[in-house]
Amino acid sequence: DAESTGFINNRARLSLGYERDRLSIGLSAQHVGVWGQDPQIDKNGRFILNEAWAKLDFGSGFFAKLGRQSLVYDDERIMGALDWNVAGRYHDALKLGYENTNNQMHLILAFNQNDEKTIGGTYYAPGAQPYKTMQTLWYKHLFDKSFNASFLFMNLGMEGGDAEKQNSDTKYLQTLGTNLIYTPSNWTIGGTIFYQFGKTKSG
């Protein structure tokens, strides 16, 4: 029989926000680890920025948000902050949006590399963000106080090239679906349908 074990996993997060006129800035730094795993004198701390973004409001409902940010949509099955996990989840992306009383539309664009390559193409080595490129369009409409619907299309580009030769071969996987919420009186009824097509990084 396996022996029982015990440990304490800890996340310490410090968040700062700044707003002025049409500009908003968000910074969030965190340290994640198990108690006792770091030496008392540590020259290589694991303190990272999990959020660092700037948002500019253009007026009339239009805005742009650039930088490291959480992407949280609907019930978070497809895109969420994953804050139940000790580390959480973040994306380096540009978000363009329009919002009014009954409508929200967001376009999210991302391009990832894990090295400052100046030659040799755009091969994206594994081990960092799971995707190389991302384009996501999300739209939500509030029909009335009891019913709203959202639609999402996501195109993920994942590196499927030769790791030894570092030849890039991007494979594209698409996700398309809707999230419906109906709230009559004290009840909430929800439905979610999604379909995936395209190719994974293995083909």
Mark where each language-model region is.
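Short acidic (Asp/Glu) patches
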Residues: I48-L49, I78-G80, Y90
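Signature for the C-terminal beta-barrel architecture of outer-membrane proteins
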Residues: S60-A64, L82-G203
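Beta-barrel outer-membrane channel/assembly domains of diderm bacteria
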Residues: D1-L71, L94-M105, H141, T178-Q196
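"Short basic amphipathic alpha-helical interaction patches in structured regions
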Residues: I41-D42, I78-W84
